[in-house]
Swiss-Prot record:
Provenance organism: Aspergillus niger (strain ATCC MYA-4892 / CBS 513.88 / FGSC A1513)
GO MF terms, alphabetically ordered: ATP binding; ATP-dependent DNA damage sensor activity; mismatched DNA binding
Subcellular location: Nucleus
DNA repair recorded as keyword: yes
UniProt protein name: DNA mismatch repair protein msh3
GO biological process, one term: mitotic recombination
Region Mispair-binding domain, annotated ranges: 201-329
Length: 1119
């Protein structure tokens, strides 16, 4: 029956509902009509609307309306109409229902205010309540029917998470109902189920079980970026997601960043921000985060789907735990580490040492301020097991701390307790910037230090090593006991650091590294030359001063190693030149023998062996010791060590090596000693399974544990039952047997053709898994049950295989020391061959060593500049002797090569004591105990110290530490103040160095006045030398040619204007400077001439001054 209101569908008081798909599932917002429409509503449409309502109610008694697709008229819901007019009191009050729309007269302000009323207002006429109730009842019934239709439609589509459900939510959120009260029916409707993190209700604090897990772990590790395993991905949540997105360049889905219910986010965000990475890329992304300086934690699911399904907590979320923590220093889960593959010898990257350094300090006894402090350090390299410790007193310049930080170059610092201001500023300076001297930003962590830290630390360290002493084997008992006793007797500050470091490393599961007491080493053991921090930077030992990479450094020049562990050993050699003459001669003799053409065959054999070593054995061994090694890596390590040991299996004694050098013989003899143990471990492993990382077949059958065998038998039994079940399934289909199919990774599918008669015989209990137009694939109930049993056996087998592998690693770890010794022996051979390669270059000579302190070099060259220059380097001689000329006063023009010359002398001395050949025609070197440099000018703004203050402070440190066996280089001391003060200080320091300390000294200056000091040394302890040059032309055409040769005497001019011209300063400025320079020179010359005339007069008058004649001669030469 057509609706009565169809004729008046165009009436202004009603709206026709559109017949669209959205009408099924979108609740139409019932908004109030505009004032102009409501106020002018006519009687005729209203009467028609009432009539239609009455007819509809009569019709519904006979037939319920079930289809909402027909056109029906919907009046605006007048539940709580807020208009600028009020409801008509009754229908009679509406004038002329048939008249056309008339505009009412304009209302005054008071009238508008009076008529602005709601239906609930007491002023409203209650006569309208009857018709109002009828309208509300009709609207309610219509809404209820629409809701029923909507829920049917949603159920048919498949839930609120389908596309249309999402669309409905979007529409309803985009068009909220304004001014109307919420419908009771809508509130009563059950909310659609949400998935994952979306379960957190908007404006509420309800969290999913997995989110609760993440928050619980995060609260314990607030300083850690957590990577959480969720199914087939690893995910970051909250603030961690933002950090990961920035560092890894991945997408971050917006959401809450904070892990607390903070009002700023909780009110309008219902889930955490998140980012994700694939499982197989975990190690790549973790390495990038760690290299960026973050502390990263990996949270894994520690139960599998099959075991979870069989367990009691099948309905609970997966159990997750923090399984791994990584920082720069503790990242050892990758054989290559953070440094990546072995760089080329000419590469520019700085090799990371990977040291964690713990430091603590206290005021020195008798000092109440921070001027003198007692410092303790412990540095550990988890990737190799090396441990360095020291206890020392430091002055207000903190030069001792700086020296150790630059030598060790830690990638992480652990600070125990509060540091003094001076130390704190030094640490910030060395570790704060991206381009610091360590080559990268250093991670800094801090722990508190209690007042009773010393006693607590000693107790903690003692208990840590107590178990170690009990388990020491009889063979190693004496050595282990002595080493452990040495550890327990460490100084107080070192013990505090050691205790803190043990506790710190427990967090990463690496505390076992401290059980390797054999590798404890004292930093300040005076078995090597001291190179302080200033010297390391000034002489560019590890890094150049331009871009802080290794290219152009001494280490870069000497690094011809083929292995990573050999490279690390050479780095130690370069930073710690030997003081023991016998060890030094032993090393240089080994280099000489390897360089000998007669030994070419043996050397090539060694080079070939080193070339075959592709893995970093030292790091892999420590990973085995920690129990973190992978199966393919273990196979590689053992096979490589077997290859090394077998290469020299015929060597039974040092006489069998074919070399005369003791150092080479000891290294080669050490290699075959591990063969028996390595072969025994390899015999337990299935090579092909280990290569493919097949944990199930990793062990050979004879070596499998009982648990592994039981689980494999269980799997075999289940698979046998599955085979037998084929005939049972075939009988049900009317066949003798059926064949199992595997599709899309799903096994044991029974395939039935849709066109065959067998399809009608498929029992209802069979579960259809997949199908095509031609076939359908099923699982029988028996197959499902047996597959579940098989999966449980597989999971248990995987756990048993992992446990057996960990036990094998523990067995190999008991042989760590002999294996490490053999790797160290191979590293020694690598370093010696690298030095032999350097020695084979033209122009390199074997130095002669003497106990007498001297440096005598003929035609020496700068080792690094020579390699970087395309042109040939101009060689120079040097002759310093503690009994003859101990000091040289070096003068010369700017850019004349003074600094290169003095650096060349120091570098040749250092190379000689490393055990290397040196770039010269001949060299005789004494055993220097230290090289000190004071070069370059910079201020220390953080400490409020000027350039001159830094200059003099460093000079004061040198004067305290230098001995008669030291080489001291002072470059332009005194230039940071006025000329008179600068000359006075420079002269006093130089005199003190030569007369009192008696060090070998190279003193660069532009103060020609100092040249007269040579006359006060009768035995020529001090000599004047200058960098030679030639000048041509005069005035503006004057040109200087640098010869870069050292000559006797003094350079009376510095030719600074020549440098200004090379720097392209404006010509007018140069002319003015040249004029001023001439005026000043003429003025000084006149003064000298006047002094000379006076001196001549005194001589004529019969002065008895013995030095007068020499002064006259000197003055005449200067004129």
């Amino acid at each position: 029956m057509p609706l009565p209101s169809s004729q008046n569908s165009s009436s202004p008081g009603v709206k026709r509902k559109q017949s669209t798909l959205a009408s099924f599932f979108t609740k139409k917002p019932q908004t109030a009509q505009q004032a102009s429409v409501n106020v002018v509503e006519e009687k005729s449409p209203a009467a028609t609307f009432d009539k239609a309502d009455n007819q509809e109610r009569a019709a519904k008694k006979d037939k319920a309306l079930t289809d909402d697709e027909e056109d029906d008229i919907v009046a605006p819901a007048p539940k709580r109409v807020r208009t600028n007019g009020l409801y008509p009191a009754s229908r009679e009050e509406i004038p002329n229902s048939t008249s056309t729309t008339e505009r009412p007269p304009a209302l005054t302000s008071s009238q508008r205010t009076e008529r602005f009323k709601f239906s609930s207002s007491p002023a409203v006429n209650t006569g309208v309540e009857g018709s109002q109730a009828a309208v509300e009842l009709e609207a309610g019934q219509r809404q209820k029917e629409r809701e029923e239709l909507h829920h049917k439609f949603v159920r048919k589509l498949g839930g609120a998470d389908c596309l249309i459900g999402i669309g409905r939510n979007a529409i309803s959120e985009a068009t909220p109902e304004e001014g109307a009260e919420p419908e009771d029916e809508e509130e009563a409707a059950p909310p659609p189920p949400a998935k994952g993190k979306a379960a957190a209700k908007k404006g509420g604090s309800k969290l999913t079980p997995m989110e609760k897990q993440v928050i619980d772990i995060k609260r314990k590790h607030m300083d850690t970026v957590l990577v959480v395993e969720v199914g087939y991905k690893f995910r970051f949540f909250g603030e961690d997601a933002r950090v990961a997105a920035k560092e890894l360049s991945i997408v971050c889905i917006p959401g809450k960043l904070r892990f607390d219910e903070h009002p700023s986010e909780a009110s309008h965000l219902d889930r955490f921000a998140s980012a994700s990475i694939p499982v197989h890329r975990l190690h790549v992304h973790v390495k990038r985060l760690v290299a960026a300086g973050h502390k990263v934690g990996v949270v894994r699911q520690i139960e599998t789907a099959a075991l979870k399904a069989a367990g009691d907590n099948r309905n609970a979320p997966f159990v997750r735990k923090l399984t791994n923590l990584y920082t720069k220093g503790t990242y050892i889960d990758d054989a290559e580490g953070l440094g990546g593959p072995m760089p080329a010898a000419s590469g520019g990257a700085s090799p990371a040492t990977g040291y964690l350094l713990c430091i603590t300090e206290t005021n020195a006894k008798g000092w109440g301020n921070d001027e003198k402090v007692q410092v303790g350090i412990v540095a550990v390299q988890p990737a190799t097991g090396d441990i360095v410790y020291d206890d020392f007193e430091d002055g207000f310049m903190r030069s001792e701390i700086e020296t150790r930080l630059l030598h060790i170059a830690p990638c992480e610092l652990l600070i125990v307790g509060e540091l003094s201001k001076a130390t704190e500023k030094l640490v910030q300076h060395l570790s704060g910037s991206k381009l610091n001297v360590f080559g990268d930003k250093t991670r800094v962590e801090r722990v508190l230090k209690s007042k009773t830290a010393a006693a607590e630390s000693h107790s903690h360290v003692s208990s840590f090593y107590a178990g170690k002493m009990k388990t020491a084997s009889a063979a190693d008992d004496a050595q282990a006991s002595s080493l452990l006793q040495k550890v327990l007797n460490l100084p107080e500050q070192v013990t505090i650091c050691l205790s803190s470091m043990i506790e710190h490393m427990k967090e990463y599961g690496l505390e076992y590294v401290f059980e390797l007491t054999k590798y404890f080493q004292h930093f300040s053991s005076r078995s090597h030359m001291l190179l302080n921090g200033n010297t390391l930077m000034s002489l560019e030992i590890y890094q150049n001063q331009t871009d802080h990479t290794t290219k152009g450094s001494l280490f870069w020049t000497l690094d011809r190693t083929q292995t990573r562990f050999g490279q690390r050993m050479l780095r130690k050699w370069v930073g710690r030149p030997l003081l023991d003459k016998s060890r030094l001669e032993e090393r240089v003799n080994a280099v000489e023998e390897l360089k000998n053409p007669e030994k070419t065959v043996m050397v090539e054999r060694l080079k070939g062996l080193l070339g075959k070593v592709k893995s970093d054995l030292e790091k892999s061994l420590i990973r085995i010791y920690y129990g973190k090694c992978t199966r393919p890596e273990l196979l590689t390590v053992l096979q490589t060590m077997q290859m090394i040991a077998q290469e020299f299996s015929d060597v039974k004694s040092p006489a069998d090596t074919g070399f005369a050098s003791t150092a080479i013989n000891e290294a080669i003899t050490c290699l075959p000693t591990i063969l028996e143990d390595v072969v025994a471990f390899l015999d337990k492993i299935n090579m092909h399974a280990a290569k493919s990382d097949d944990k199930y077949a990793f062990f050979r059958e004879a070596e499998e544990t009982e648990d592994i065998s039981d689980q494999k038998l269980g799997i075999a039994s289940v698979e046998h039952e599955l085979e037998e079940h084929r005939s049972v399934a075939g009988q049900k289909l009317g066949k003798k047997t059926v064949e199992y199919k595997s599709v899309a990774g799903i096994d044991y599918l029974i395939e039935v053709e849709n066109s065959s008669a067998s399809i009608k015989r498929v029992p209802a209990s069979w579960v259809k898994v997949s199908g095509t137009k031609k076939v359908s694939r099923f699982h029988t109930p028996e197959v499902i049950q047996l597959m579940r049993q098989r999966d449980q056996h597989k999971e248990a087998l995987a756990a048993a295989c992992d446990q057996a592998f960990i036990s094998l690693l523990a067995d190999i770890a008991t042989k760590y020391q002999p294996f490490r010794d053999s790797v160290q022996a191979l590293a020694t051979l690598d370093c010696l061959i690298a030095l032999a390669t350097i020695a084979s270059q033209p122009g390199y000579v074997k130095p002669e060593y003497t106990d007498h302190t001297c440096i005598q070099v003929d035609q020496g060259r700068h080792p690094m500049v020579e390699q970087l220059l395309l042109d040939s380097y101009v060689p120079n001689d040097i002759d310093l002797d503690s009994d003859k000329t101990r000091a040289l006063l070096v003068t010369g023009p700017n850019m004349g090569g003074k600094s290169s010359y003095v650096r060349q002398v120091a570098l040749i001395a250092i190379m000689g004591q490393i055990g290397s050949y040196v770039p010269a025609q001949s060299a005789k070197l004494g055993m220097l105990d230290a090289v000190f440099t004071r070069m370059g000018a910079f201020d220390n703004m953080l400490a409020g110290e000027s350039t001159f203050m830094v200059e003099l402070s460093e000079t004061a440190d040198i004067l305290k530490q230098a001995t008669p066996r030291s080489l001291v280089i002072l470059d332009e001391l005194g230039r940071g103040t006025s000329t008179h003060d600068g000359v006075a200080i420079a002269q006093a320091v130089l005199d003190y160095m030569v007369r009192s300390i008696r060090s070998l000294t190279l003193f660069i200056t532009h103060y020609q006045h100092l040249s007269s000091m040579v006359h006060s040394f009768a035995d020529q302890e001090l000599r004047n030398v200058h960098m030679r040059f030639t000048e041509s032309g005069t005035g503006t055409d004057e040109e200087i040619t640098f010869l870069y040769e050292v000559g006797e005497g003094v350079a009376h001019r510095s030719y600074g204007l020549n440098v200004a011209r090379l720097a392209n300063l404006p010509g007018a400025l140069l002319d003015q400077a040249r004029q001023k320079s001439k005026e000043l020179e003429e003025k000084i010359r006149r003064r000298k001439l006047a002094g000379l005339v006076t001196a001549v007069g005194e001589v004529i008058e019969g002065s008895k001054d013995e030095n007068m004649i020499e002064r006259l001669i000197s003055s005449a030469e200067q004129l």
